């Protein structure tokens, strides 16, 4: 290839395309087995990759591996108008034989890849925690719908949200991005947010499995350990993920923290034990690794 392609996330993309209502599926269920049967090994591998296109000159090289989806960061939206974003995303779709998943992180608060651009939104979306504190769960649902509609209007069909971590301690690394409430309230938030996103027609991603509450460090910067007991994880951290899955969440994103009670040898993103907790319920994404 002319340029090095940055592979950001591994994702079970074939399963996602078959199961997620957020993508307009132009290949019928009866045609999919035939399509897969005609794919080369290289093409099948490409379909399980969720990648980032660093610049427009890279698009042809990137599409040659037939990726399942493209993840867009803040710098991919920066300074662009709505029409320019739509044109960029459509150019990706036009070069793909299979409809692409186009993903972005628009949680609200500190993670606003799209609404940070004033050309795309009048102001940055507030965090779910702030919205909840101001107007309760009804306001959170309305906000989730507004975010979904904005992303879909641009051609983004997956929002890497909601944050399902249970955090009530302001010193936790994930506190500001969480709802800041207990497990039961967080589970209700996740369930209603996923339902709102499904109703809008956008894919949701629960994160960061099996929970990032009660952890003080950033696993992007170094090794982070979670010392909670397995019982505490089952009774608290897993509740929002279970609620989100039952509500019809599209995916689960796995964190990089090492959860000692479940697998003390591997970070969650590389843990067969933790992956196997999900495989019978839902496909999952590995937390992005920094290039």
Name each model-derived stretch.
Residues 18-19:
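C-terminal motif of bacterial Sec signal peptides marking the signal peptidase cleavage site
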Residues 25-102, 106-116, 283:
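N-terminal hydrophobic targeting/anchoring segments and the immediately downstream early-domain regions
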Residues 126-194, 198:
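A substrate-binding/cap region within the structured catalytic cores of diverse enzymes
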Residues 48-56, 128-140, 222-235:
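Active-site mouth loops of central-metabolism enzymes
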Residues 53-63, 140-147, 238-239:
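Short, acidic/polar
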Residues 48, 63-79, 160, 168-169, ...:
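Short acidic, glycine-rich surface-loop motifs adjacent to enzyme active sites
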Residues 40, 78-91, 100, 110-112, ...:
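Second-shell residues forming the walls of enzyme active-site clefts
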Residues 1-9:
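Positively charged n-region of N-terminal signal peptides that target proteins for export
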